């Protein structure tokens, strides 16, 4: 019994001593860079410090007061009715009036510019024009042009082109989109039938 208890006692003392020494060594290692940095900072401060010929002087309260008064920014109130030049190109919600700023020539140029941007839009936003319709339909055989689907396709596409050219007449938006989607589906069907028809004409 005495042998077991002495072994336990020895193990306990070894464990505690190793634990305590590791803690003290770790804390010493953590503190060492701190001391070194303070010493290095002191040396650096002495090297980079104030030159010998220059003396430090204290700032008086009056100088601080004068310095603070110079730093105040004087703001003048802006005139209420004047619109700054930088606001000339802002949208209407920022106070620019389209009737005052734009001439009829500028308005016509703007409309022409928006019409020229239509070819980059997808088909359901009005990309197809009458020229494109005639080009696509000219490539189809004559028999398929007389069919009901191609005539409906031609009608839907020309009607869509007329709606783009005359935006003053308001059409129900949902109806225009459904007609355009139907026209796209019919055009895809005709495009799928075109190789078959060409093969039949060769025979």
From Swiss-Prot:
**Where is it localised?**
Secreted
For the modification Phenylalanine amide, the affected residues are: 94, 125
Query: Could you name the Gene Ontology cellular component terms for this entry?
Result: extracellular space
Q: Which residue intervals make up region (Disordered)?
A: 161-186
Q: Any keyword Signal?
A: yes
GO terms, molecular function = neuropeptide activity; signaling receptor binding
- Give the record's keywords alphabetically: Amidation, Cleavage on pair of basic residues, Neuropeptide, Secreted, Signal
Picking any one GO biological process from the record gives: negative regulation of gonadotropin secretion
User: What does the tissue specificity note say?
Assistant: Isoform 1 is expressed at high levels in the hypothalamus and eye. Isoform 2 is specifically expressed in a region between the dorsomedial hypothalamic and ventromedial hypothalamic nuclei.
Q: Which InterPro entries match?
A: FMRFamide-related/fGRP
Q: Does the keyword Secreted apply?
A: yes
Q: Which residues form the propeptide?
A: 27-57, 97-106, 128-203
Signal peptide positions are: 1-26
- Compositional bias, Basic and acidic residues, is annotated for 171-186
Please report which protein family the annotation says this sequence is part of. Belongs to the FARP (FMRFamide related peptide) family.
Q: Write down what this protein is called.
A: Pro-FMRFamide-related neuropeptide VF
Q: Which gene encodes it?
A: Npvf
